[in-house]
Amino acid sequence: MNRRDFLMTSSCFLATPAVALAAQAYAPGLVKQLLSEGKTVFVDYTTEWCTTCAAQKRTLARLLKETPAYGQMIEFVTIDYDQFGRGELAKELGISRRSTLVLLHGDQELGRIVAGTSSKQIKALLDIALSAAMAA
């Protein structure tokens, strides 16, 4: 391997976030199943092309790196808004747009952020989720 190949390969690893959001890809019924198991579920309605969604993902990845308990205690589910934005769950939750983060536990919605990218705001939602998960 020559130096150029090594540098190009190495730069790919540096561009990858240190902690990726370990979210489950959505399938109909998944969120209800997790809730019936007593889990605290953090739902992210997102798209590949949404810049606000990308900012939310970066913030979530950083917060998960800072507080690993979030990833250990909370179930994260990513829902493609383009595919499921008009689906049954979206209707039940009243989801009107992408870049919506919803926190669920049991049969209750514990919090919601619509198009917010503030680290403080997202951390507050994660803290509520962590408290709910630990109390369960």
Question: What positions do the PLM features span?
Answer:
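Short active-site neighborhood of thiol/selenol oxidoreductases, capturing the structured segment around
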Residues: S36-E48
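A short beta-strand-turn-helix
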Residues: Q24-K39
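Thiol-based oxidoreductase modules, predominantly thioredoxin-like and allied folds used
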Residues: Y70-R86
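Structural micro-motif
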Residues: L93-V102
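The canonical Cys-X-X-Cys-His
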Residues: C50-C53, L101
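Non-catalytic, surface beta->alpha helical segment in thiol-disulfide oxidoreductase systems
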Residues: L103-A135
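N-terminal export signals
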Residues: D5-A22
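Typically the conserved alpha-helix immediately C-terminal to a functionally engaged Cys/Sec
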Residues: A54-P68
